[in-house]
C-alpha cells in the first residue's frame, strides 16, 4: 500500500487536531460544518468519542464522522481506526473506535486519552509506517497491527473476523 493518509475529525476544541499535528503525517480533516469530504486514497481514521459515560453509548461517534462514512467511497478506503476518549467516562472510553471498527470491519489500531502522550504519538506513527510499507498478506498485516488497549480498566481487545 503506497499511498496512505490520516483522515480525522476534531471538534472546535481541537484536541484531536493537536494530536494529529504532532504526528507530522499527511492528513485531511473532516469538516465540523456540513461540507462534504470525499477521499480517493487509503486512510487511517482518527476519531474522538462523544458519549455520556457509564453504559450510555449514544452519540459516541460524531455526526460528521457518520456522514463521512455514509459515503461508500470513503468507507472503502478506510484501513483502520484510532480513537480517543476520556477515561473519566469509564466504559465509553474511546468507544467510537470499536463501534466504527465493527461496522466497517477494519482493525481498531490504537486508543488514547484526550490529547495523547508522546508514547501515543510514536505508536501511531509506527502503525502508519508499518501499514504504509507493509507488503505481506492482508490478514497477517491486520493481525500484526492490532494493539491492546492500554488503559488499566479495559481488558485487552483483539479484532475478530466474523
Swiss-Prot record:
GO terms for biological process: protein modification process. One of its GO terms (molecular function) is FMN binding. It holds the Pfam family Flavodoxin_NdrI. It comes from the Bacteria. Gene3D superfamilies: 3.40.50.360. Disulfide bonds: none annotated. NCBIfam families: nrdI. Belongs to the NrdI family. Probably involved in ribonucleotide reductase function. This is Protein NrdI. It comes from Streptococcus pyogenes serotype M28 (strain MGAS6180). The lineage of its organism: Bacteria, Bacillati, Bacillota, Bacilli, Lactobacillales.
Amino acid at each position: 500500500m503506497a499511498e496512505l493518509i490520516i483522515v480525522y475529525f476534531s471538534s472546535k476544541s481541537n484536541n484531536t487536531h493537536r494530536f494529529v499535528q504532532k504526528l507530522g503525517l499527511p492528513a485531511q480533516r473532516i469538516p465540523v460544518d456540513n461540507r462534504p469530504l470525499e477521499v480517493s486514497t487509503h486512510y487511517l481514521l482518527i476519531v474522538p468519542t462523544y458519549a455520556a459515560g457509564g453504559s450510555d453509548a449514544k452519540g459516541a461517534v460524531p455526526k460528521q464522522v457518520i456522514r463521512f462514512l455514509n459515503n461508500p467511497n470513503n468507507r472503502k478506503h478506510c484501513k483502520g481506526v484510532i480513537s480517543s476518549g476520556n477515561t473519566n467516562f469509564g466504559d465509553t472510553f474511546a468507544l467510537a473506535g470499536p463501534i466504527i471498527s465493527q461496522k466497517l470491519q477494519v482493525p481498531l489500531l490504537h486508543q488514547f486519552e484526550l490529547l495523547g502522550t508522546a508514547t501515543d504519538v510514536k505508536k501511531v506513527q509506527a502503525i502508519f509506517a508499518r501499514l504504509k510499507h507493509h507488503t505481506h498478506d492482508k490478514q497477517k498485516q491486520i493481525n500484526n497491527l492490532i494493539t491492546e488497549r492500554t488503559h488499566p480498566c479495559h481488558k485487552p481487545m483483539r479484532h475478530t473476523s466474523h
